[in-house]
């Protein structure tokens, strides 16, 4: 007989703790966690340390890049 496994430990953590954990990851990796579940979609808003690599953002000028950056905050 197959037993159901208990919920993983990380799912039991409060959102604030998960936000702190995401703060320790590179921003690109932290952002990619938003596809894990509905709960994870909003956790990036709890990250208190975002570090963007502007070399991967393709915009014609700094003004457009700044508009994009502020739109996601």
UniProtKB/Swiss-Prot annotation:
Xref: InterPro entries: F-box-like_dom_sf, F-box_AtFBL13-like, F-box_dom, FBL60-like
Alphabetical list of Pfam families matching this protein: F-box
SMART domains cross-referenced by the UniProt entry: FBOX
Domain F-box: 7-55
The organism's place on the tree of life at top rank: Eukaryota
Gene3D superfamilies from the UniProt entry: 1.20.1280.50
Name this polypeptide is given: Putative F-box protein At1g47915
């Amino acid at each position: 007989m197959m037993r159901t496994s208990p919920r993983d430990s990380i799912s039991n953590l409060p959102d604030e703790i998960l936000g702190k954990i995401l703060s320790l990851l590179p921003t690109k990796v932290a952002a990619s966690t938003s596809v894990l579940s509905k709960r994870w979609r909003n956790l990036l808003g709890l990250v208190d340390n975002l570090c963007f690599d502007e070399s991967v953002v393709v915009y014609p000028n700094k003004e457009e890049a700044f508009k994009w950056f502020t739109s996601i905050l």
